[in-house]
Amino acid sequence: HAFHIWNVIATDGGAYQMLDGNGYGMNAEGLYDPELMAHFASRRIQHADALSETVKLVALTGHHGITTLGGASYGKARNLVPLARAAYDTALRQFDVLVMPTLPYVASELPAKDVDRATFITKALGMIANTAPFDVTGHPSLSVPAGLVNGVPVGMMITGRHFDDATVLRVGRAFEKLRGAFPTPAERASNSAPQLSPA
């Protein structure tokens, strides 16, 4: 369910950041760039039609959630984050790291420029189902090239315990050493790179 939690946080939070914060969240430490914020605001207002379909969806859905529900969905999603974090923490008490495909499917060709809006958005957001939960829980994660499936590169995501980024990096490095260098385009063309079995 962590992906669904992320979905609400990303849409409501993303809409607020894009529409009200002009590219910035509020109450964050660090420097702000007022010129950039003003530029972002003017360009967003003048050229909203140039935004990608995915950005438009996030902006409209999030704005709707904030204005009609007063941010309650965002608050509920934020309140569920500790449960998602605890579920992964439980698994990580049994294992040093969790390993999964970076994408939930083998990458496909980019959609054509004239593809319908629903297909474009589905393809864009479908890729992040395995990575987005850790954007919410804050677990350190790393994607490393894992090989090829039917000639298409695939990634392996390694996720570890909070504040144990070093283990995630060590496991990633060990896998890279064991697997060998990722094939160059010439190697891929000659089909000399090791192939993985599709899952």
Swiss-Prot record:
Transmembrane segments: none
Source taxon at top rank: Bacteria
InterPro entries for this protein: Amidase, Amidase_dom, AS_sf
Pfam family, one: Amidase
Annotated GO MF terms: catalytic activity
Protein name, as recorded: Uncharacterized protein in nthA 5'region
Organism: Rhodococcus erythropolis (Arthrobacter picolinophilus)
